[in-house]
């Protein structure tokens, strides 16, 4: 990790990663890096660590999409691939449909917005810190709504640190200012953190990388 403020060195630092799934997804989409959607998130996180750091667990926060059907299928395939990873857990929020007016044409449409991810991440970070399960919380997000748990960690558990890893095309000055360190996830990390083209589940079923993600 880079751009990290000075801290007391230790023989080994336990790291738990907290990944804001849609913040990462929309960052990749903004960068037009669809070929990196097929990410082994555990490997991506591992590739961000320093030699003295050990990845204890990866927590992925997302919501199930329900339309269009082809997008729902691609997400389901990706989630099933993630479920083959032993030290990764998925936490679900939900979509809430909001009626919005188009600025250009004036028509109204239902626009889904993802809910609960920031709350779920905050709860997990604070819970893990309280149970002394980590030395470093690695937050993969640029959502400024996540400043509150960083402040809480610094106040309640000053011996622990929060490092922010910004997804591609994403940044938050507030998170950068509050965190103990930060980095930007780049192409090189993503390129070496992909699942293989085919992923076999425990029951023998083989998952295929979606064609649109190649």
Regions found by a protein language model. Give the residues of each.
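Nuclease catalytic cores that cleave nucleic-acid phosphodiester bonds
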Residues: 89-214
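Domain-level signal for Mg2+-assisted phosphodiester chemistry and nucleotide/NA-binding surfaces
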Residues: 2-112, 161
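Short, motif-level signal for alpha-helix interfacial/capping segments enriched in acidic residues
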Residues: 1-4, 120-122
């Amino acid at each position: 990790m880079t751009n990290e403020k000075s801290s007391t060195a230790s023989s080994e630092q336990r790291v738990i990663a907290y990944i804001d799934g849609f913040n990462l997804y929309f960052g990749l989409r903004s960068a037009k890096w669809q070929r990196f959607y097929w990410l082994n998130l555990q490997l991506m996180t591992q590739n961000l660590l320093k030699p003295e750091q050990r990845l204890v667990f990866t927590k992925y926060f997302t919501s199930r999409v329900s339309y269009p059907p082809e997008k729902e299928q691609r997400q389901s395939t990706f989630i099933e691939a993630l479920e083959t990873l032993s030290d990764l857990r998925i936490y679900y929020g939900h979509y809430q449909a909001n009626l919005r007016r188009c600025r250009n044409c004036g028509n109204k449409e239902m626009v889904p917005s993802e809910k609960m991810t920031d709350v779920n991440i905050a709860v997990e970070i604070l819970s893990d810190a309280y149970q002394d399960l980590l030395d470093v919380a690695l937050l993969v997000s640029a959502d400024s709504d996540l400043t509150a748990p960083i402040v809480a960690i610094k106040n309640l558990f000053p011996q622990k640190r929060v490092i922010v890893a910004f997804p591609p095309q994403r940044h938050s000055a507030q998170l950068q200012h509050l965190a103990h360190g930060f980095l930007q996830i780049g192409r090189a990390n993503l390129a070496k953190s992909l699942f293989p083209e085919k992923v076999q589940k425990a029951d023998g079923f083989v998952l295929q990388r979606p064609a649109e993600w190649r």
